């Protein structure tokens, strides 16, 4: 090929040098696995450790016992997706010869929380089984069977014990050992070593298998020690230890027990744990250090709960579609919001962030429905433009008498119970329609945060008292203002009221100030036809340029 044949890309309008593209380069093509596999010396050792980490032999045995599963989806978190090709290869090598005709699909990008089973993504390929790898919340899903493979990560227990004894010098202190689902594999051994070192008041946690449905199973799950008993159930964990004279309950944990957690929990789960234990100590397995905070606080949650009391428009943000009970929770929330005279909008958003939620300015506050382990947004630094609360906090806010208990309930079933109690307080049940309570919805309300009077906290309460005139045939006005709201074609709209009060209402809103403005709308004209490279005026311009060049 000659130099004339080499195609050179067009020069950009702005100068770019090598430094502009350094973010796309990597110093090494090796993938970092040592923090969960341990030190590696060769490629053969990598293969063996991956086989042990994922318990591939036991996973293969499960699939051989269940040949009815053909379309198998493998779900990975971001930290483990690099191992997906290895796992699929190992499964295919062992299972291709049995004649079942299995197909494997890697779900590399989950729509919602990584700890939840992405049932929606699995249904896209008509999967009949989901194998979930890594940490898991064990929330019950709607339909598909699921197999959990937590993995067995490497942990230098000698270094951990040294850090532990330095942090907890009092061997009589009451301590609870906990970790994410993957590192639970090390918890019983750590408990035994601490007991042998003289720590007398230590309890440990294991995965609560009672949450599993009949179509769910855990591969190579950790079994409790034979000389320990169940002491207390805490969500998706069961606390184990030597039988004590006094039973452990929530009050005992909150007032007497320190939590030692291997790995840093996600913010929602961490906030929940701060309301359960007297103190929190987290161990970073990568840096091998213990941290004592700062951690998320309920103080901001209390403030946002009071903001929800005077919010006129509530956005219900659904951050999960797989967890059982989501639809029931949404329906009961909508009923509770309506009975309190407030407006609501329903949004289903995968991985919500600041730009996504900023698009909906009329929303005064967000109520998020998501996994309690990692699917709830805890906006600790005020990055979002509007506050974000949970269904339980919204239920507290819409009660006529606010009672702040200091608890943080994130379980759907418990939240549904609280909503039912609030509806009962309003005099409403599933067989009734309307508000039969004696509470005065027209009573003035004041913002507990600012102390100011709020007139728009119940925008729909005036619907029963609003009298509207039927529009005449000659009336071309779409929007009408009346006492109590803004009306579009006979329907009260809080969104239009919000838009009308803005200084700038969108592109074209100032056309009425231009000459030739048509009140009935723009005149319909014939537009351009054809394809973009062959518009008629483009052809005429090209012919004109060609003629000028020939002259």
UniProtKB/Swiss-Prot annotation:
The keyword Lyase does not apply. Binds 1 [4Fe-4S] cluster per subunit. The cluster facilitates the reduction of the catalytic iron-sulfur cluster in the DPH1 subunit. One of its GO terms (molecular function) is 2-(3-amino-3-carboxypropyl)histidine synthase activity. InterPro entries: DHP2 (IPR010014), DPH1/DPH2 (IPR016435), DPH1/DPH2_1 (IPR042263), DPH1/DPH2_3 (IPR042265). GO terms for biological process: protein histidyl modification to diphthamide. Signal peptide: none annotated. It comes from the Eukaryota. GO terms for cellular component: 2-(3-amino-3-carboxypropyl)histidine synthase complex; cytoplasm. Its cofactor is [4Fe-4S] cluster. [4Fe-4S] cluster binds at residues 116, 137, 371. It is found in: Cytoplasm. Keywords: Cytoplasm, Iron, Iron-sulfur, Metal-binding. Pathway: Protein modification; peptidyl-diphthamide biosynthesis. NCBIfam families: diphth2_R (TIGR00322), DPH2 (TIGR00272). Belongs to the DPH1/DPH2 family. DPH2 subfamily. Component of the 2-(3-amino-3-carboxypropyl)histidine synthase complex composed of DPH1, DPH2, DPH3 and a NADH-dependent reductase, predominantly CBR1. Required for the first step of diphthamide biosynthesis, a post-translational modification of histidine which occurs in elongation factor 2. DPH1 and DPH2 transfer a 3-amino-3-carboxypropyl (ACP) group from S-adenosyl-L-methionine (SAM) to a histidine residue, the reaction is assisted by a reduction system comprising DPH3 and a NADH-dependent reductase, predominantly CBR1. Facilitates the reduction of the catalytic iron-sulfur cluster found in the DPH1 subunit. This is 2-(3-amino-3-carboxypropyl)histidine synthase subunit 2. The gene is DPH2.
């Amino acid at each position: 090929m000659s130099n004339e044949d080499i195609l050179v890309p067009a020069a950009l309008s702005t100068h770019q040098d090598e430094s502009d593209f350094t973010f796309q380069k990597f110093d090494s093509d090796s993938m970092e696995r040592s923090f969960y596999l341990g030190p590696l010396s060769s490629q053969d050792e990598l293969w063996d450790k991956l086989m042990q980490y994922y318990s591939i032999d036991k996973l293969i045995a499960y699939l051989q016992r269940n040949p009815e599963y053909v379309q198998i989806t493998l779900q990975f978190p971001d930290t483990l997706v690099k191992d997906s090709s290895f796992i699929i290869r190992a499964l295919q090598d062992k299972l291709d010869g049995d004649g079942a005709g299995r197909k494997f699909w890697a779900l590399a990008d989950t729509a919602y929380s990584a700890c939840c089973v992405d049932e929606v993504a699995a249904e896209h390929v008509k999967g009949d089984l989901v194998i979930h790898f890594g940490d898991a919340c064990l929330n019950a899903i709607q339909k598909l069977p699921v197999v959990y493979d937590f993995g067995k990560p490497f942990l230098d227990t000698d270094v951990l014990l040294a850090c532990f004894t330095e942090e907890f010098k009092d061997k009589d202190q009451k301590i609870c050992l906990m970790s994410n689902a993957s590192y639970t594999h090390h918890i019983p051994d750590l408990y035994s070593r601490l007991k042998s070192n003289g720590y007398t008041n230590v309890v440990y946690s294991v995965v609560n298998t009672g949450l599993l449905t009949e179509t769910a199973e855990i591969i190579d799950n950790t079994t409790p020690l034979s000389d320990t008993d169940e002491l207390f159930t805490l969500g998706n964990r069961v606390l184990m230890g030597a039988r004590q004279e006094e039973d452990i309950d929530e009050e005992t944990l909150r007032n007497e027990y320190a939590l030692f957690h291997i790995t840093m929990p996600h913010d929602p789960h961490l906030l929940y744990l701060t309301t359960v234990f007297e103190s929190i100590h987290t161990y970073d397995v990568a840096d091998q250090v213990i941290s004592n905070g700062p951690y998320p606080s309920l103080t901001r949650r209390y403030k946002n709960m009071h903001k929800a009391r005077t919010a006129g428009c509530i956005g219900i943000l659904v951050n999960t579609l797989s967890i059982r009970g989501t639809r029931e929770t949404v329906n009961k929330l909508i009923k509770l919001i309506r009975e309190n005279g407030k407006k609501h909008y329903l949004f289903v958003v995968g991985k919500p962030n600041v730009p996504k939620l900023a698009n909906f300015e009329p929303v005064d506050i967000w109520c998020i429905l998501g996994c309690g382990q990692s699917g709830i947004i805890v906006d600790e630094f005020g990055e979002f433009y509007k506050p974000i609360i949970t269904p339980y906090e919204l239920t507290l806010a819409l009660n006529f008498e606010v009672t702040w208990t200091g608890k943080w309930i994130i379980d759907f079933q418990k939240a549904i119970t609280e909503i039912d109690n609030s509806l009962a307080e309003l005099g409403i049940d599933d067989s009734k329609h309307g508000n039969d309570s004696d509470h005065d919805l027209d009573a003035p309300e004041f913002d507990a945060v600012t102390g100011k009077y709020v007139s728009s906290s119940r925008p729909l309460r005036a619907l029963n008292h609003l009298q509207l005139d039927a529009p005449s045939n000659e009336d071309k006005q779409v929007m009408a203002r009346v006492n109590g709201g803004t009306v579009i074609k006979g329907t009260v709209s809080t969104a239009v009221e919000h838009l009308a009060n803005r200084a700038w209402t969108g592109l074209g809103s100032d056309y009425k100030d231009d000459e030739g403005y048509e009140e009935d709308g723009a005149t319909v004209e014939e537009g351009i036809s054809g394809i973009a490279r062959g518009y008629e005026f483009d052809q005429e311009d090209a012919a004109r340029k060609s003629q000028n060049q020939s002259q």
